A protein has these predicted regions:
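Surface-exposed interaction regions that form or flank ligand-binding interfaces
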Residues: 1-91, 128-282, 304, 336-337
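Generic structural "secondary-structure junction" signal
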Residues: 84-86, 117-119, 125, 285, ...
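Phosphate-centric recognition/catalysis
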Residues: 94
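Active-site beta-strand-loop-beta-strand hairpin of nuclease catalytic cores
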Residues: 97-125
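Residue-level signal for well-ordered alpha-helical positions
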Residues: 109, 118, 193-194, 300
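Helix-hairpin-helix
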Residues: 271, 279-327
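Long, highly charged low-complexity segments enriched in Glu/Asp and Lys/Arg with interspersed Ser/Thr
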Residues: 325-337
Length: 337
């Protein structure tokens, strides 16, 4: 009986039948937590709110991918937010997924609107603007991005490999280390009817991610060796402990310095301008702009007269007399920061 139990334990330890999150920590989560804390301390900071919105969108995308992977019955190790460096090259990989045969480098995209990939492999984003009109814009290829990330990892492996292993890496690395671009927004329509077939197999929606991985594993060569659970864990451990860069940044302090310094410095610049303008015109400072109006200027930072008029921060007479000069001060400060 003891022999049978040991045999069962050995089989279970050899084969992995469910996903394991080996590294869950995410830079985006740390940034989000820091921004939320700062938001409760700094009121009405438009730049902070824009940064928070961008970080939140990325975090939602990352979480969606982890959620989908954890629903799978595929035995795999999931590594989230892996940053590696080779000489002057740095790669920040959203996910590395290690399966018994293939390792996947995953780039997450959580975009508003739809994505079309044309016959040349160009990524084109389409969305409806505030005027309910369709807009199209080309975007940097996320596929090139994740391929570059994989290439950094390849360079690291080549540097550490023996002469014989280097030949194997050069020949087979791309075959066993696949790249995927995963579209995380469930409302995004992905149009790849004209895309090259080589690209169609590398871009998927999040809800089809597990299906893609299963297809690859099912269609792998029949005589392909499968890595055991211990081998997969060994590789995951090596990536996280030996290769992954941990910068230990304090994002709260970083963001606090960025957003409070920006506001305070611009405030002092506009106050200096107001004082000087009032002297030049022989008027009191309130006739340039009041303290309440100053806070609105700091909040929205308009850079055109049209925007200043639209926001209704200042009355028409102040815009006519001082508007362009105020805009110039904001633009000058923005360029210098």
């Amino acid at each position: 009986m003891e022999f049978i139990n040991k045999l069962i334990d050995k089989i279970v330890s050899y084969n992995l039948t469910e996903p394991i999150v080996y590294k869950h920590e995410s830079e985006l989560q740390l940034k989000y937590d820091a921004l939320m804390k700062l938001k409760s301390e700094i009121k009405e900071n438009k730049e902070l709110e824009q940064e928070l919105l961008m970080v939140k969108k990325g975090l939602i995308g990352e979480n969606e991918i982890e959620y989908q992977l954890m629903k799978s019955d595929i035995g795999m190790y999931i590594l989230r937010d892996i940053k590696v460096k080779y000489k002057d090259l740095t790669a920040q990989i959203d996910y590395i997924v290690i399966t018994p045969i293939y390792t996947y480098f995953i780039e997450c995209k959580n975009l508003m609107g739809n994505i079309t990939i044309d016959s040349k492999g160009n990524f084109i984003r389409e969305w409806i603007n505030s005027n309910k009109q369709k807009q199209w814009i080309g975007m940097p290829s996320p596929l090139n991005q994740v391929e570059n990330q994989r290439n950094v990892m390849k360079k690291i492996k080549l540097e550490q490999a023996s002469s014989l292993d280097k030949l194997m890496i050069q020949k087979y690395f791309e075959d066993y280390n696949k790249v995927l671009v995963v579209v995380a927004n469930q409302y995004t329509i992905l149009n790849m009817t004209k895309a090259p077939k080589s690209i169609q197999s590398k871009v998927v929606r999040a809800d089809r991610l597990n299906e893609r991985i299963k297809y690859d594993l099912k269609n792998a060569p029949k005589d392909e060796n499968k890595n055991s659970k211990s081998k997969m864990e060994e590789r995951a451990k090596r990536i996280v402990e030996k290769l992954c860069i941990n910068e230990n940044k304090d994002y709260y302090l970083e963001y606090k310095e960025r957003f409070t310094q920006t506001k305070n410095t611009l405030k002092s610049e506009l106050e200096r301008f107001r004082e000087q303008r009032a002297k030049e015109k022989g008027i009191t400072t309130n006739y340039v702009f009041t303290d309440a109006e100053l806070e609105e200027l700091l909040k929205y930072k308009p850079t055109t007269i049209e925007t200043l008029i639209k926001l209704k921060i200042l009355p028409q007479i102040k815009i006519k007399c001082h508007g362009q000069e105020i805009i110039n001060e904001i633009i000058k400060y923005t360029k210098n920061t």
